Each structure stands twice: as structure tokens, then as C-alpha cells.
Amino acid sequence: MVTRDDVVEALHGVEDPELGMDIVELGLLYDVEVDGPKVKVIHSLTSMGCPAGPMIQEDIQRVASELPGVEDVQIELTWDPPWTPDLMSDDAKFILGFG
């Protein structure tokens, strides 16, 4: 059975194409809920007008659906709390010049 950690690890493969870094390191992944074969991914984007939003959501859907045992993936886009660079990992801040 898939675990939350499995999903988070897989989501390192979803990249924000504008920033060239994955959504986990960017702090865009807010939560992952796993209930048997069902996975719910709660995430944000760097801005409300992010042109890469639909592509990021498609990638989340694809990556999570490819995990063994996952039958249903729900994706929730949230703006609460609003994303800020403070949510990025230390490595991401350094690489992108925020550190």
C-alpha cells in the first residue's frame, strides 16, 4: 500500500517549469492525504496567475496515479496560506538566490 512518504517522494518529480525546481523543494506542496488507494494532494502555486498551473496539476495527477496501488487522485489548489519564498527548502532558497 502506498504511503504519504511514497507520494511526497514521487512529487519531487513534478517541476515548476518557470523556476526549474520541483514543487516539494519550492514549498508548493502543502499536504498529502492517503486513504487506502485514494490520494489527495493539496498544493499552491507561486502566484494566482501562474501560467504553469495547469501543467503542474497534470504532472501531479500523472505522477501520483503511477504509484502502485493508487486508484484515485484528488488535487486541491489552495491559496491559504499564500505561498511565499519563506516556504522553500533551504537548498531551493540558496539555488534561487533567496538565501
Which residues are covered by each model-predicted region?
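Domain-level signature for proteins that mediate thiol-based redox and metal-cofactor handling
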Residues: 1-99
